[in-house]
Amino acid sequence: AMRNIRSFKISLIFQEPATSLNPVMTVGDQIVETILLHTPLRGEEARAKALDWLKKVGIPEPERRMKSFPFELSGGQKQRVMIAIALAAEPNYLIADEPTTALDVSVQAQILDLLKHLKETENIGILLITHDLAVVAQVAARVGLMYAGELVEEASAREFFSKPLHPYARNLLKALPEGKQKSQMLEAIPGMVPRLNREFHGCRFAERCKKARPECSQHKVVLQEIGDRKVRCLFPENDPVELPRSD
C-alpha cells in the first residue's frame, strides 16, 4: 500500500545527494528504476522518459549523462539528478528536505529556481523543509514554523515575514543578521531548546518567551485559527516586526 503512495503520490528529495545516489548504478539506470517501479512504461519508453527528465532538470549533455556514474557529476548536477528521480513517477507532491544545504550559494539559487519552475510546469505541490529563512522568503507561498516538535505558526509568506503572530517567530526574525552593522550586537533568543523527551504541560516556548504569563505553562496550547492563519499561542501579537534593512 505504501508503494502506491511513495513516488506516485508523494516523493522526497534528501539534503545530501552524494549519499542518496547509488554509486554503482548509472544515472540513467537510477531514474529508469523509479519509472519501472511506479509507471507502466518499459524498455525504450522508460529510458526515453528518463532522458526527458534529465532535460527537464537542466542536465547538460543528457544523452551522455545517462551513462555517467554519480562520482562523475558535480554537487549541483547530483541534486538535479535526485530531483529527476523524485519526479520521474510524476507525483502530486514533492517533499524537499534541505535540498540546497550541501551546495554553494550560486548553485543553491539555481536549484531553488529549478524547483519553482517545476512547480509551475509540472503542477505539483512542494513542501520545503529548511532552516534558512532567506530560502523561505525566496520560494515559499505559505510558511509553517515549528518549535520543539510542534507547529507553532502557519501563515502566508507575506504575513509571516511582515506580521508574525507567535513570539518565537517574531524573535527569530529579529535575530536575522541582514542589514546590521558589524558593531551592532545580534539579537538572540535566551535559553535553550527543551529536550523533546520531557513532559510538557503548557507552551513549549514559554521558558524562553519574554512575554510569557503563568497560564502559558499551565495548560496545553492548541493551534487557533485567526483568519487564514494558525498560531499556537494564548497571547498572539499582530503588530509589524521591524526587520533589519541594508542601506
What are the functions of these language-model segments?
Residues 3, 95-99, 103-184:
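P-loop NTP-binding/switch modules centered on Walker-like glycine-rich loops
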Residues 18, 24-37, 47, 51, ...:
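Short helical segment in ABC ATPase nucleotide-binding domains corresponding to the A-loop/adjacent helical element
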Residues 31, 83, 107, 111:
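Hydrophobic anchor residue at the start of the ABC signature
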Residues 45-64, 173-174:
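Conserved ABC ATPase "signature" region
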Residues 68-73, 77:
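Conserved ABC ATPase signature
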Residues 88-92:
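A short, proline-enriched helix->beta-strand linker immediately N-terminal to the Walker B motif
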